Amino acid sequence: IGSDEEVMRYSPQKIRLVNGIGSVRISPLRRQLFKNFKCKGYQFENVIHPSAIIANEVILSEGVQIMAGVIIQAGCQIEVNTIINTGSLVDHDCLIGQHVHIAPGVVLSGGVVVDENVHIGTGAVIIQGLRVGANSLVAAGAVVIQNILSDATVAGIPARELYRN
């Protein structure tokens, strides 16, 4: 469509937006764009690929993007501006916070809590009942078997903290 200024030529009551910015690690750009347009009264549409399977009892907040082959089981809640990418599995009773990017092929076992502004890399696995703290990065292929503190970067099998911001 063009620049942010061009979008703002349209009344917030006349259009709904889709956030086209992805994530390769924790980046404020996607979150900032969402918040900037929300402050101006714009609404964001959910985008759900037709091959995604989402249980009836799932709660999706505004601006959620669910890609091809994703399965989300009953009792899950997905907060605003979150991406669940291709082929990821989100089992029962997971809570995924705002501005999260779940990369392709991630597995979240039942009851996992992912706090806001987290990036979970391709193919990572998080076992049941764990929490991933806010602003954390889970590296591709990691297997998480214990809670992750906020602002941490973890990698490996099993996942170990590399550093904390």
Regions found by a protein language model. Give the residues of each.
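Structural signal for interior beta-strand "rungs" in well-ordered beta-sheet cores
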Residues: 46-162
